[in-house]
Regions:
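Conserved ATP-binding N-box helix of the HATPase_c
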Residues: 31-57
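Generic alpha-helical secondary structure
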Residues: 13-17, 34-41, 82-84
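Helix-loop-beta hinge of the Bergerat
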Residues: 2-30
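Short acidic/polar alpha-helix capping motifs at helix-coil junctions
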Residues: 8-10, 21-23, 34, 89, ...
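Conserved beta-strand-loop-beta-strand hairpin that lines the nucleotide-binding pocket
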Residues: 1-3, 47-116
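A short, compositionally biased N-terminal segment around positions ~18-40 that is enriched
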Residues: 22-39, 77
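Residue-level signal for functionally critical sites in structured catalytic/ligand-binding pockets
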Residues: 17, 30, 35-36, 107, ...
């Protein structure tokens, strides 16, 4: 089974979900809705977009049902991690149960909420 990949140019969580639902097959929609409810808080999404401001292009991959990887590039096309953003998110109570890590131009968001 190949990895799911989509590039997004969106302004809000509603848009990201709508774009993903258009890109992926119908059988993936329940997983995407779980991602929306459990993981894509405004705080997480806003912080990722802040990092990707120059292009607003996010490449999303879903290596597992509990993990989403967002890759982004700056205006020169270079990978651009922002560790201070990850630290801010880690301390945000709204992201409890969600870990966010920025590395090598990617933002990995992992859900750690069993049974939710």
């Amino acid at each position: 089974m190949s990895e799911r990949v989509v590039t997004l140019d969106v302004e809000s969580i509603d848009e990201i979900v709508a774009e993903l639902e258009r890109e992926f097959s119908a059988q993936d929609v329940p997983t995407l809705l779980r991602l929306r409810a459990s993981m894509l808080t405004e705080e997480v999404f806003s912080a990722v977009r802040e990092v990707a401001t120059d292009t607003a292009k996010l490449r999303c991959t879903f290596p597992s049902p509990r993990t989403m990887v967002l890759q982004y590039r700056d205006k020169d096309g270079a990978l651009k991690p922002d560790l201070s953003m990850a630290a801010r998110l880690a301390k945000n109570p709204c992201t409890d149960g969600v870990s966010v890590a920025f590395h090598e131009g990617s933002c990995t968001v992992t859900i750690d909420r069993s049974g939710s």
